[in-house]
Amino acid sequence: MSEKTIAIKAQKVEEIADQFKNAASAVVVDARGLTVAQSTELRHQLREEGIVLEVIKNKILTRAAEKAGFAELNDIFAGPSAVAFSNDDAVAPSRILKKFADANEKLEIKGGVVDGTIANIEDINKYASLPSREGLLGQLMAEFQFSIRSFAYAVKAVQDKLEEGGEAAEEALAAE
């Protein structure tokens, strides 16, 4: 192998190692057997969420994972491997790939890294069932609104009771 080829591969290992370190999640799949149309559709769905799907040689993946501190991943780098890297949403790759794998049995999820932690297939499936970040924030805001609204109704009820009862209600409230 020429020095130029070795340098190119070393640079690729560095790039992939950096992606593993900096990504919110990296999910490894085996996309063997997908048609060109299916592969294009999968890449399109991932790209809409800002996720990059790269087919990478296992030797490069192995070295990059070791360099990034994820040597435990080396067991899943068998057969053709593609990695979906997301820098923003840790759950989106799991959700999209799981949904696509359910519809296309040829796509096999192998595992990955989510928020710096090694994730096996079961973990990826759990992450896939979580709502998106925006969905979770929406649920949190709904809870805040409910709590504030309930407090406002309680204050209003006390005020109404005080207005109805006059001094007797004030004395009862002070006694409590």
Curated annotation (Swiss-Prot):
Entry-linked InterPro entries: Ribosomal_uL10, Ribosomal_uL10-like_sf, Ribosomal_uL10_bac, Ribosomal_uL10_bac_type
GO MF entries: large ribosomal subunit rRNA binding
SUPFAM superfamilies given in the database record: Ribosomal protein L10-like
Keywords assigned by UniProt, alphabetized: Ribonucleoprotein, Ribosomal protein, RNA-binding, rRNA-binding
BP-aspect Gene Ontology terms: translation
Pfam family, one: Ribosomal_L10
GO cellular component: a single term: ribosome
Record keyword Ribosomal protein present: yes
Membership in a protein family: Belongs to the universal ribosomal protein uL10 family.
SUBUNIT field: Part of the ribosomal stalk of the 50S ribosomal subunit. The N-terminus interacts with L11 and the large rRNA to form the base of the stalk. The C-terminus forms an elongated spine to which L12 dimers bind in a sequential fashion forming a multimeric L10(L12)X complex.
PANTHER family named in the record: 39S RIBOSOMAL PROTEIN L10, MITOCHONDRIAL
Function recorded in the entry: Forms part of the ribosomal stalk, playing a central role in the interaction of the ribosome with GTP-bound translation factors.
NCBIfam families noted in UniProt: PRK00099.1-1
Protein name: Large ribosomal subunit protein uL10
Gene name of the encoded protein: rplJ
